[in-house]
C-alpha cells in the first residue's frame, strides 16, 4: 500500500498547486464509457501468457477547476465493471489450453490535463493517478486437452508451476497506478472521447508470503475505450 502513497500524494499536491493560480472554471460533466481490455497477470515465478480479452464499461464524472495558460486542469472519477484475467501460453508438448476470466469493479481517480479547445473542437488529454479495484467472485476458468491422445496434463508444466489452477482469489482489494492518452471531440451535443490506457497493479491477487507459491500475482491491463460526456454545470 505504501507504494501507492507517492503517486497519490503527487496527484493531490499537483491539484492543490494548480488551484492557486490560473483562470478558474467550475464545469461538471457526467457520462458513460465502454471499451475492450487486454489483460495479463504478472506472476513470479513467471508463467508464459498471451493477452486475455475482456470487456469494460461504466460511468464517468469529471470536474474542471481551471485553465492554467494552455493547460486545462480537471479531476476525473470513474466506476467501471472490468473483465480481466490471463491466458497461458503452454509450450510443454501437451497442446493444452488454459484461460481464466476475473471480474472487478474498478475505481480510477485521475488528474486530467487537457490541451486544445474548451468549447467546440478537439482537445488532447492525459489521465494519470491511482486506481482501486474490488474483486467480484464470479470467475470463469476454462482448461482443455487437445484430444484423447493429448488430454489435460499438468505434470509437464515448466518448473512444475501448477498452483494457479483452481486457486481461489485471496485478496479482494486491488490497487495500482493507471494512465492514459487520448483525444476529446467537443460538439454541441456533448463530448466524445477516445483513449488508450494502461493499468499496472501493485497488489497481488494471491497471497505472497514465503509459504505461498507466488511472490507476485498482479493484474496488468491495456484498455482501449470510448466515452461520452455531457456538461451539467459550466
For every predicted segment, state its role:
Residues 1-25, 33, 226-233:
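Bacterial Sec-dependent N-terminal signal peptides
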Residues 20-58, 62, 231-234:
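Short glycine/proline- and aromatic-enriched beta-strand/turn motifs that initiate or cap beta-hairpins
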Residues 20-27, 66-73, 116-123, 186-191, ...:
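Short loop/turn motifs that connect adjacent beta-strands in outer-membrane beta-barrel proteins
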Residues 25, 174, 179-234:
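Predominantly the C-terminal beta-signal and adjacent terminal strand-loop region
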Residues 26-28, 49-55, 101-107, 122, ...:
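Residues that define the transmembrane beta-barrel architecture of outer-membrane proteins
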Residues 32-36, 57-63, 81, 107-115, ...:
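Residues on the lipid-exposed face of transmembrane beta-strands in outer-membrane beta-barrel proteins
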Residues 42-48, 93-99, 164-169, 209-216:
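Extracellular loop and loop/strand-boundary signature of outer-membrane beta-barrel proteins
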Residues 62-141:
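Gram-negative (and chloroplast) outer-membrane scaffold detector with strong preference
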Amino acid at each position: 500500500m505504501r507504494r501507492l502513497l507517492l503517486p497519490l500524494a503527487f496527484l493531490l499536491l499537483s491539484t492543490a498547486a494548480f488551484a492557486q493560480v490560473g483562470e478558474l472554471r467550475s464545469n461538471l460533466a457526467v457520462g458513460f464509457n465502454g471499451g475492450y481490455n487486454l489483460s495479463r497477470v504478472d506472476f513470479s515465478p513467471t508463467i508464459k501468457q498471451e493477452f486475455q480479452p475482456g470487456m469494460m464499461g461504466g460511468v464517468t464524472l469529471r470536474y474542471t477547476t481551471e485553465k492554467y495558460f494552455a493547460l486545462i486542469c480537471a479531476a476525473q472519477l470513474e466506476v467501471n465493471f472490468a473483465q480481466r484475467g490471463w491466458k497461458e501460453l503452454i509450450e510443454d508438448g501437451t497442446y493444452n489450453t488454459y484461460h481464466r476470466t476475473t471480474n472487478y469493479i474498478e475505481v480510477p481517480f485521475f488528474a486530467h490535463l487537457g490541451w486544445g479547445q474548451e468549447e467546440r473542437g478537439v482537445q488532447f488529454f492525459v489521465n494519470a493517478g491511482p486506481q482501486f479495484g474490488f474483486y467480484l467472485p464470479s470467475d470463469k476458468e476454462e482448461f482443455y486437452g487437445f484430444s484423447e491422445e493429448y488430454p489435460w496434463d499438468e505434470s509437464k508444466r515448466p518448473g512444475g508451476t501448477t498452483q494457479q489452477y483452481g486457486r481461489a482469489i485471496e485478496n479482494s482489494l486491488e490497487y495500482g497506478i493507471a494512465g492514459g492518452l487520448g483525444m476529446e471531440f467537443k460538439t454541441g451535443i456533448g463530448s466524445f472521447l477516445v483513449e488508450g490506457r494502461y493499468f499496472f497493479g501493485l497488489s497481488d491477487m494471491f497471497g505472497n508470503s514465503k509459504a505461498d507459491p507466488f511472490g507476485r500475482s498482479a493484474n496488468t491491463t491495456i484498455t482501449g475505450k470510448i466515452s461520452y460526456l455531457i456538461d451539467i454545470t459550466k
